[in-house]
UniProtKB/Swiss-Prot annotation:
It comes from Anaeromyxobacter sp. (strain Fw109-5). Transmembrane segments: none annotated. This is Trigger factor. NCBIfam families: tig. The gene is tig. It catalyses: [protein]-peptidylproline (omega=180) = [protein]-peptidylproline (omega=0). Consists of 3 domains; the N-terminus binds the ribosome, the middle domain has PPIase activity, while the C-terminus has intrinsic chaperone activity on its own. Its EC number is 5.2.1.8. It is found in: Cytoplasm.
Amino acid sequence: MKIQVENVSPVERKVSIEVDPDRVAQELERAYAGLGRRVKLRGFRPGKAPRKVLERQFRAEVESEVLEKIVQQTFAEAVKVESLPLVAPPHVSVSEGVADGKPIRYTARVEVKPAIAPKDYRGLEVTRKAPEVTDQMVSDELSRLQDSLAQLVPVEGRFEAQEDDWAVIDHEGTIDGKPFEGGKAEGVTVKVAPGAISDGNLEALKGKKLGETVELDEPFPEDHRVEQLRGKTAHMKVTLKALKTRQLPALDDALAKEAGVEGIETLDALRARIRADLEKREKRRAESEVKDALVKAALAKNEFEVPPALVERAIDSMLEGAAERFARSGIDIRRLELDFAKMRADMREQALLQVRGALLLEAIADAEKIEVTDEDLQAEAARIAEELGAPLAKVQQQMRGKDAREALKNKVREDKALALLSSAANIQPA
């Protein structure tokens, strides 16, 4: 096999590969032998059909499979021989395919990690903001807790729905005059607010009195979870049965107990726990801001190109994170009218910074010969378990897989590189 590597750019290589005719012939022979054992042809016992007969019927299929197999195998071999630090799958172009007595020739364009010789990363000058927790921050957290423990109670002395009420309804729907599954229900609670009834909102009830019925058309989106309803419009009859409102619990010891925080029985104890948690959070935030500042300062002294594939992957990860946050709030991001192209464009700068920072920290770790020990991994697992409030054994179990362990190892190595930058930096109070 002949391999030629051309540097297209600091982050791209063009790999030209020529595969010997003998290897091609051997793979063809193996492919036809395997095919002969599998297929049944009239007039031949299993495994006895001559290759020429097989070629007449299956040549294109066999040659396609052999070409794919040889390209996969030889490209992997070339990557190993040339020590190419790939960051994405190759773009392959075959110039000469499978032919009797001839070599296979193809090229693969690949993105690779840039070669970085880090410099001037010691003595960086950054500022550190002192973490601060105010009484207002504690009160805000208590208010959020209070809101999360609110309950729906009947509205007293009023019989007309207002915005932000919670309405108990019976509804009956039809599509093209026919009932549909899920169209009829009783005792359903919806919010009197803008939005779709399928999302738990019904603004049309505003101003309606108990016992009144409203009629409306409800369009279902093209990506509705029920396939039969996608793109259809339902005619709904909705009857208002009861009105409820959210009632906040009092800020007292009973709320502190209801919060379910271990060891907390009084409001004063809850305030103290919230303050302690906020102090930890603000300390972590201050440390994170210093780390971000150190990375930005180091990047300012080290210019290098970044593989586009890594940036796109970082954007994908950011979008997945956004989708997960929406999902935790009960919102399907696919049903929102979002401009994903604009979102990707808006995320690009942050994604580029993330990728550049990770590549530089990896290069610094290489330059400083930073190693990660089993003790380091155990300590990180213990830290994660404490932060999540999860059993250490459970965290360790999740990290036993090869990919999870490698990801953890990379994070610990990156953290060690950051610690080195911090210890060698000139950090002044903000």
